[in-house]
Amino acid sequence: MAADRNTGHTEEDKLDVLKSTQTVIHKALEKLGYPEEVYELLKEPMRLLTVKIPVRMDDGSVKIFTGYRAQHNDSVGPTKGGIRFHPNVTEKEVKAVKALSIWMSLKCGIIDLPYGGGKGGIVCDPRDMSFRELERLSRGYVRAISQIVGPTKDVPAPDVFTNSQIMAWMMDEYSRIDEFNSPGFITGKPLVLGGSHGRESATAKGVTICIKEAAKKRGIDIKGARVVVQGFGNAGSYLAKFMHDAGAKVVGISDAYGGLYDPEGLDIDYLLDRRDSFGTVTKLFNDTITNQELLELDCDILVPAAIENQITEENAHNIRAKIVVEAANGPTTLEGTKILSDRDILLVPDVLASAGGVTVSYFEWVQNNQGFYWSEEEVEEKLEKMMVKSFNNIYEMANNRRIDMRLAAYMVGVRKMAEASRFRGWI
C-alpha cells in the first residue's frame, strides 16, 4: 500500500487508532520540550495481560474465553478504565485496547485525576449468552486478573456491553478473593453496592458541558441550536435527551442501521421509549438516511458518539457543522482533524469531551474510600466545575499556541505523566 508523501503514512496507518494516538503524543511531547525517552515510555501500555477463562456453559460444556487487561502508566496513581465484552479479537482490536488505555491516561491528566489509564475486556458476544453464563464469565475474568487489579492498583469500570450488574458480580468475586468487602475495586456499580449518583449518564453530562462551553465561545445560543448526534447508545441517547431538555433542536440521530432526520427537530422522548437495549431505533422507520449523510447534515453542533474513524479526509470537507464535539473515542482521524481546523470548525477532542465518565468514576472511588456519599446535585456540581475548568484551560492553550484543541489536550494530558515519571526517577 502506497504511503502519503507528506506523512509517510499508508491509508491503513491513517485509520490505525494506536498509530494516530502515538503521532499526537510524540508531537505534544516535542512541543513541551521532553526528550525522546519520554515518548518511548508513554507510547504503549507498560503492561498487557492476556488470560484464558474456562466457563461451564448451561448445556454442560466448557468454553474457553480470552480476556485481556492493558495498563498504560501508573506514575500518577492506580490505572483506571473500562472492561468491554467484544465478540471479535484481532490485531486491530488489541491495538484499539492499547490506544484506549492511553486515552484514559490522557483523560485523567486533562481532568487532573490521580490515575493512569487502563482498559480491558473479554472476547465474547453477550447477546448469545445466558444471565448465569455471563455471571460465571465475569467472575472467572476477575479471578484471572486479580493479581494486577485492586483499589490501589487498577480500578475497572463498565464499557461496551457491560453494565452495573456485571460490575456487581466482579466486585463480589474480588471481595471473596481479597477476603474483605472492596467496593473501591471497581466503579459503575449499583447504588446499593456503593455506586455513585450520576454515573450512568456521566459521559453524556460531560459532553453536554463541553457543548455548552464551545457554543459560548462561538456565540451560539443552545436554545434553538441544531444538533446532530451519531450513535444512540448510552452516551448518544442521554446526550440527545440533555440537548433536547436544554432547548436545542435535535435534528438528526443514528444507530448502526441508519439515521433519522427532521429539520424541525426529532421527538427524542418518543425515540427513547422505542429504542432497544442495544440502542437501536431506526429499524422501526422506513424513511431513513445513511450514517454518512447524517454526518454531513447542515447543523450547528455535530456529536459523533458511535465508533472510531467516522470523520476522515474523505468527508471532512463536507462537514457543515460549526462545532464538532467527540463523544466517541477516536471518531476523527488526524487528517480529518486538520481539515476541520483549516475550515475553522471548532473540534472538541474525545480525551476532553468524553472525560465525564472517568470523572464520576473517580467520585465513586473517593466515596467508597471515605464511606460518605454525595447527592446527585453534588456530583453534577463537582463534575461541571472540573469539566469547565479543563475545557477553558485547553481552549486557552490552543488559542495562545495557535494549535488545535486535540494537540492542546494531549499536551496537558502527557505533561502530568511525564512530570510524575521524572520525579519518580524513571526518566
Curated annotation (Swiss-Prot):
Keyword Oxidoreductase among UniProt keywords: yes
Catalytic machinery residues: K119
Binding residue positions for NAD(+): T203, N234
Chain residues that bind substrate: K80, K107, S361
Annotated keywords: NAD, Oxidoreductase
UniProt keyword annotation of Oxidoreductase present: yes
Short name of any one Pfam family annotated for the protein: ELFV_dehydrog
Residues at the site labelled Important for catalysis: D159
GO-annotated biological processes: amino acid metabolic process; glutamate catabolic process
GO MF annotation: an example: glutamate dehydrogenase (NAD+) activity
Substrates-to-products reaction catalysed: L-glutamate + NAD(+) + H2O = 2-oxoglutarate + NH4(+) + NADH + H(+)
Top-level taxon of the source organism: Bacteria
Induction: Constitutively expressed.
EC identifiers of the protein: 1.4.1.2
PROSITE patterns: GLFV_DEHYDROGENASE
Consequences of knocking out this gene: No visible phenotype. Cells lacking this gene show no growth defect; a double rocG-gudB disruption has the same phenotype as a single rocG disruption.
Matching SUPFAM superfamilies: Aminoacid dehydrogenase-like, N-terminal domain, NAD(P)-binding Rossmann-fold domains
UniProt-listed SMART domains: ELFV_dehydrog
Quaternary structure annotation from Swiss-Prot or TrEMBL: Homohexamer.
Family label: Belongs to the Glu/Leu/Phe/Val dehydrogenases family.
Known function: GudB seems to be intrinsically inactive, however spontaneous mutations removing a 9-bp direct repeat within the wild-type gudB sequence activated the GudB protein and allowed more-efficient utilization of amino acids of the glutamate family (called gutB1). This 3 amino acid insertion presumably causes severe destabilization of the fold of the protein, leading to an inactive enzyme that is very quickly degraded.
UniProt name for this protein: Cryptic catabolic NAD-specific glutamate dehydrogenase GudB
Lineage, opening ranks: Bacteria, Bacillati, Bacillota, Bacilli, Bacillales
